[in-house]
Structures are given as structure tokens and as C-alpha cells.
Amino acid sequence: MLSLGSGGAKSSKPSFVSYVTPEEIKLEKDPQKKEKHPDLLPGEVVFCSANPILKYTQDDLSQRGVFGTLLCTNFRVAFISDDAPQEEMSKTFKNKLYGENDIPLMCVDHIYGVYDEKRKLITGGLVKNKCPSKMIIHCKDLRVFQFCLTFSKEEDAKRIFQGIAHHCLEEKSLKCVFAFSYLRSTNPEMLRKREAIMFDSPEDWTQEMKRTKAQCRLVTENENFELSQRLPQYFVIPSALGDLFNYQGKGLPIWCWSHHSGCALFKASFPSMTQEDGDFQSHLDTMITAVARNYLYSVKTEDLSESLPTLQDIQQSYNKFKQYFLIDNTTDFWLSDVKWFSSLESSGWLDIIRQCLQKAVEVVECLEKDNTNVLITEEEGTDLCCVISSLAQIMLDPYYRTLMGFQSLVQKEWVAGCHAFLDRCNHLHQKDKECHSPVFLLFLECVWQLVQQHSPAFQFSETYLTVLSDSVHVPIFSTFLFNSAHHRESVMKAESPIAQSRPLSCPTVWDWSVQFDSKAQNFFFNPLYSEKVKHERTVRRPHKHKHQRQLSLPSSAFKTPTKKGFFKDETDSLKKMLRVKRISRWMGSPDSPVVASREFYESWQQRPLDYHGLLLPSLDGPSVRIWMQRYLRWIPEVHIMGGGSVAIMTKLMELLSQVEDLKRVLEQRDPSLATQPDHPPPLHHRLPSFGSSGRLSSSFPFTYSRNRSFKPIIPTGLMQSLMVADNLANQEDETS
């Protein structure tokens, strides 16, 4: 590690002076030293490299860094330090594909060049001006890298800068993505590991319908995408729908999930419901009538395009929000700290999260309380429909709160549901900004809110969600590489060698062994998860009588029921109801949907707590929080050494371990209390080892405690001045 300051030695820039020159480093370490290369993955090749390059650290105001080699491959930007790694603990949670100083090309968000102390955004791969003295890379996982290029030869510095800018920023075709080079050099048999229900076969859908007791029809007519290229090969629809080829795959109500009362959740792609087109309204009536006839319940529809922000609004809001976490240095951090809360509020990102959770609660209320079918729609039916349907199922179905269940849910609603991951994540750096939007990240944000509010209800941890959000930008997994099932099939067939009988098969992100070993995967599990023991049948909370599902449709008019929720008249009455577009307008009271949902939440809160039953989020202002692990893990100034959630979790695990020990003692004294065969494994076999919390930072397991030099910060305001004075006083107390 080198310390750079304002001394008097010569350097390439008068304002930047090194106490140790690169020449001295070469003499000290190895006169014959060559550029270092990382361990390359199968199919990975090096495009360009430069040495020596100084990588800055962000620990404090003094310009510190470490020398090494900077490379650009067809998979990543990599920095190989000349110093030996100092932290043994870094092996505890290590990604097999890339290290802490590696950036997958898809993960690069923006590149800046520093010219004469002025930062300039680089928008293309061709650098017309002179090579900058410094390169700053902002990553989509919120990391910030700063490289000084002045110590290497000018031609090497320009080559590495142009190479990185070209391969990270220039528009490219999908066949240039590293996944295909990786697949051709990897044994396909090693990539077949089933960690989730893939919903790519009729058997998977049949199993899911059986699990939820759904009475629908499995569609196999699109197996070769003859019906529609925007629909999955297999999907489920109401049984009452006729010939699907008449609809050309448009506006079909696709089944998502069935409630135990018999009502169900559907989603569909519809243009805006404000249209007065007669054909459109007739088609809409046909679809909703089919949903209603399937279960003999009324249907409530919701056009998400009207009630939730647009994709462009989501993109703009997140762009503002993430800027407050891309910190270049300590000075920038303290300047942003002065207006931290007002800046976050002005971005509107947390409000969008709240709106999505609110809409999901409204859907849950219709299914759980009103016992009505719900049909959510939007223009494509593959963006916000995926968000709301997935959130509603997590709140209603405890299976989706397990690791296997959650991964199966993402596979069903997002991957098989044809969410356009390639376009929304902008993996190919397309210039069309209208199709870019972090919709899947928005979903993960909403799930994190549920996890942090109801931790014992979830088998997976926030670390799992953070890693999943990072994995979106790793160009290997088929889960996030394509826009639809048809897109995936056509691309994989085209890229397969002619001599190969079957098409190439990408690994899915659910095969976590590709990225992490078994010890690291233990961090994906929540140690506070309240598992439901099979032999102890928990008595469900008493609930009001649910309507019994009728398995056949009467040939005459609908029978008028005594309870609200059934059809009261024939189709004419139904068509009048279909003109209503919003769930909020279907509410029985004149109150707003927010007020109605608030009453629903308060009613749920008064019931006995059941982590394996209905789960609702609190939407009050303080309850919707910032995902601290994801957004603050790379900012050293906010890390708490030996504190934060890691310290709390360590203490809780110590207590849980003592409980396990007491259970074993009781079982030894009374064999009748012995663990049943179907009981989950002992706690210490399934929990990660946190070690001593005093050695860890609050951002563990992504970063660890480091030896840092703390220096007083020049205050920028009265409050900061008081804080600095208080910190200095505390430091004096500690040293005295």
C-alpha cells in the first residue's frame, strides 16, 4: 500500500507527488516483474492490459492506493494487485467467477475520465482526446473504482482506457456476450442442476396447479411458439376460453395463483382500458367472463398502467436515487450527508416501492377478504404485472418464502412469464432508453421490505437478495439474458455447433455452486427463520366462512347467492360491472383504497401472529426503509466495526445455539422428546459461521474490517462541526 500526498518528489503531475516511485517498487520487489494475469474462466481471453496502474482506495482524504496490472477481458475488467492479499477472511464469502477488484463488463454503469482535475462522462468507446490522467468506473452494484493512468506508458494507458470504454459502453450483439464463449468451453453436464421448478414443461405446471388446487386448463399449443412468440411454451388459462388461435396470443388471462377459497389471480396484456373501441371492449368482456365462469366468482380488474408509475418514471427515479450511493471519496460523502434525507426523498424511489406494496396489498385484500378473482393488466403484461403478482403470492403463500419456493416463483412469473430482462437491464447498451427500467430490482426492493419487517417468515436472508441483485449483471446465466422463452430458444439454437445434437444450455442463476462454495451459500439462509414442523400441525387462525367452489356451471342463469361476491344476475349484469376499471372502485366503502387497505392491515395485525399464514407489510413512512446492505456496503464511512446487524445476528445465533444445546440435553433425558425424522437439521449444521463480531464490519460478508487511518473532516456546516468536535472528544476519552 502506497501513501501519496503533497511532498516534494518529482512525478508526472506537479500536484500529485509520490513518496515511493514506481522505479523503486520495481527494484524492491522484482527486477524481472511482468504483468500479472488473473485465473481466466473457460472461454475468457484478455483483450488489453497496462502496468503499472494505481488503484485508489476510498478510506480517507489522503490519496492512497496500490499498484498493479489493469486488464480488460471478454468477461470483466480486472485489477491484479502487486501486493499479496492480506485478508484471510476474504475466502469465507468469495465469488468463484470474479473477485473484489473485478468488474463484469455488464456491471459497468458509467465511465468518467479526469482531464486537468475535471471529470468528464465517457459516452462511447472511441477516445478522441488525449488519454485522461484518471479513470473512474461506476458499477451497477454501486461499487466505485478509480485508476490513475499516469504511471504507465502513454500508449499502454490509452489502449487500456479505450479498450475498457469500447467493450463496456459500445452497443453490441447478444452473440458477443461472454456466456456463449463460456458455454463452448464448459462441460454442459456440469451445468445441469435443478435448484428451482423451471416451469418449462407441462409437468411443472401440472404440479403447481395440483399444489394450489387450481381448476384451469394447461395450454400446450404454443410448444413451438405457433400461437405467439411473446407467450411461454406452456401456460395456464381459464377452462372456459375457446380456440386460442382466434386471439393470436393477445389479451389472454394467464393464471398466476389460486386461493384456497377458490378465487384466483390472473394477469393479461391489454392496451390502455380507456379506449372506446368496440372490438376491444368485446374482447375484454370475453376474457373476463371466462375468468368468472371458471370459478363462479366476480372479477375485479386493475390496469397497472393507470395506477402505478411508468417504466420511464421508474428508471428516472432510480437514476436519481443511486447517485447518492456512488461516492468517489470521503469529501463527497460528507457533502452529500448534509442533505441526505431530502435528496433521497426527492428521488421518489422509496415512494415507488411503497406504491407497489400498496397495490399488492389491494390485490391480496380482494383474494383473501372479498374472495373475488383478480385480473391485473398492462400493455405488455410482463413488467409491473410480474411485480404485483409475485408480491401478492409471497404475502399469501408461505411456500414462496422458502428459498426453493422463491426461486420457483421468479422462474414462473418472470422467466417463464417472458419478462424482457435483456432490454430492461440494457445488457447490450442499446441507445433506446425507453425500454430500460430496473423492474426486477424494484421487485427485489419490495421483497426486502417484507424480509426486514417479517424476518422469521422467510427462509432466505437479505444477503441472498443482495447477491441475486448482483447476479443480474453477470453475463453467464440464462435467467437474465433473454427477453422471452422464444428469444432464448432461437438464440441458443443459432449459437449451437452444427455437429451438436442438442442446443447449448446456459446455467441458471439458481445453480449457486457456479458462483459460491457450500460454506458461502450458508449465508443465503436466514438463521431466524421459523420453520413449520410437519408433525406439529399448527391450528390456523379462525376465519370467516369461505365460499365453496362450484365444480360445474349451471345451464340456466347464475344462481343468486345469499352472500356478496357471487354474480347476482346473468351476463348483462356482469358486463355492467366490467366497465369498472380500478380495484379501488370495487371497494364496498367510499373510502380511498389506501384507507381501506389500512383497515385491512389493522384487522390482520389484531390476529394471532402466524409466519406461515397471511403476511402484510407496514406502509407507514418509517417502515419503508433503505436497503442498507446493498447500497451502503461499499462506503467505508458508514461501516460499524464490530457493530450493526452482524453484531446483533452473532448474539442471536449464540442464544439459538444455546437453545439447541438445551434441546439435546432434554432429548437425552427423555427419549420421547427426540427429534422426528422430518424435523429440520440442527441449527449449527445450516447456519454460516460469523466468527467474532469484533473483527467484522456492519457490511459483512461483502467487506471486512480493515486497518484505516481516521482523520478529522473539515466541517461544512454547524451540525457537522459539532459532530466533529464530539468525535474528537470521544477519541480523547478513549485514548486517556
From Swiss-Prot:
Return the GO cellular component terms, semicolon-separated: cytoplasm; membrane; sarcomere; sarcoplasmic reticulum
Task: Supply the Pfam families for this chain.
Answer: 3-PAP (PF12578), Myotub-related (PF06602)
Q: Which UniProt keywords apply?
A: Cytoplasm, Sarcoplasmic reticulum
Q: Which PROSITE patterns match?
A: PPASE_MYOTUBULARIN
Task: Spell out the subunit comment.
Answer: Heterodimer with lipid phosphatase mtm1. In skeletal muscles, the interaction stabilizes both mtmr12 and mtm1 protein levels.
Protein name, please?
Answer: Myotubularin-related protein 12
> Which InterPro entries does its entry note?
MTMR12-like_C, Myotubularin, Myotubularin-like_Pase_dom, PH-like_dom_sf, Prot-tyrosine_phosphatase-like
Identify the domain of life. Eukaryota
Q: Which SUPFAM superfamilies match?
A: (Phosphotyrosine protein) phosphatases II, PH domain-like
Q: Which GO terms describe its biological process?
A: locomotory behavior; phosphatidylinositol dephosphorylation; skeletal muscle fiber development
| Family assignment from sequence similarity | Belongs to the protein-tyrosine phosphatase family. Non-receptor class myotubularin subfamily.
From which organism does this entry originate? Answer: Danio rerio
Instruction: Give the chief site where it resides.
Output: cytoplasm
